[in-house]
Amino acid sequence: MAVFTSKINRKSDLFNNNKEDFTKLIKKMEDIHLRAEKVSERRRSKFIERGQLTPRERLSKLLDKDEIFIELFNMISFLVDDDNHDTSISGGSIIAGIGFVCGVRCVVFVDDSGINAGALTAKSIDKALGCLDISLKQKLPFIHLVESSGINLMNYTVEFWSNTGGMFYGLAKLSAAGIPTIAVLHGLSTAGGAYQPGMSDYVIGVKKNGMAALAGP
């Protein structure tokens, strides 16, 4: 096998200028990621009032301590629903990634109900399909923390939502392949948000808080 030796001069002006520019871009990206967390955090008082954890607190308590969590697709939806670079929120109202639960590597999918009540955007579906595909190919259990008002009907167009059924098809494929699908229903979930528990192999409902309704309460 041929050996390729780097010829980068780490002391050169070119290298250091590129490093500085790239570091600034990384900081911008991190600020965009943090924006979604800050917007969700504004609803903290409502979560406390309902006796709930915030989405990120719930995720943190689910994951094994001292194990890495690799967040996936966290730039999705940026400049899609809002074309203003300074206000657009990335992530598609979902926190998703790969982490360990009781020592088992899993795909974890969390509805961020602090953002538009967890309503799905057009790109939320793409994020879900990507996570389901990873779960199937890597044979990783799929855990969904469910609290969603379903599709955002205020921005509904057929062409954007035509692949929504792929989410349910993906869950069915995982189940058929013997890969566990687990839904934790911990809040009010309507319409599309209610299908997830119904199609999962295992459902955990939080007493007095978890509720699913196909059309409305």
Predicted segments, located by residue:
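Short alpha-helical segments and helix-capping/turn motifs at coil-helix boundaries
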Residues: 82-83, 92-95, 127-130, 167, ...
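Extended active-site and interfacial segments that coordinate phosphate-rich ligands
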Residues: 113-135, 201-212, 217
